[in-house]
């Protein structure tokens, strides 16, 4: 992103972003301290590479981003597949091709990366179930 010199440029850039289409799919890689220490940057790069090999990187079809901390640090690195909300735990760079292939191409969750088959989404986990995300609802 270019450096913005003033408020006018910021407003212009904001208008530009507002006019861009939302990606149909998004992979959020937790960028919190615990996940970063566990290899989230390498995972992020591996997901970008795998998406690029499928012709999806930086397209309207898919966006791969680092998010803020999700709070479940001992299970990191974490990945959330949107809009489905599939929540993967203890993800490694070696899992990137499977995530891109299964979750994005085939439309199926990678069940070995979720805590239990009945807990595919973050909201299904006991840690997140009582929480209501307000300010950080669009984490990232």
Residue map of PLM features:
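Feature of Fe-S/electron-transfer and energy-metabolism proteins
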Residues: 1-140
């Amino acid at each position: 992103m270019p450096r913005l010199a003033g408020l006018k440029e910021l407003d212009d850039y904001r208008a530009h972003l507002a006019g861009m289409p939302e990606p149909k799919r998004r992979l959020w890689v937790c960028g919190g301290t615990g996940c970063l220490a566990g290899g989230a940057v390498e995972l992020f790069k591996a997901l970008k590479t795998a998406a690029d090999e499928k012709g999806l990187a930086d397209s309207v079809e898919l966006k791969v981003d680092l998010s803020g901390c999700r709070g479940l640090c001992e299970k990191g690195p974490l990945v959330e597949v949107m809009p489905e909300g599939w929540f993967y735990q203890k993800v490694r760079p070696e899992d990137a091709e499977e995530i891109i292939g299964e979750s994005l191409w085939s439309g199926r969750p990678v069940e070995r990366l979720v805590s239990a088959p009945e807990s595919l989404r973050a909201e299904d986990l006991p840690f997140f179930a009582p929480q209501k995300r307000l300010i950080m609802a669009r984490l990232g």
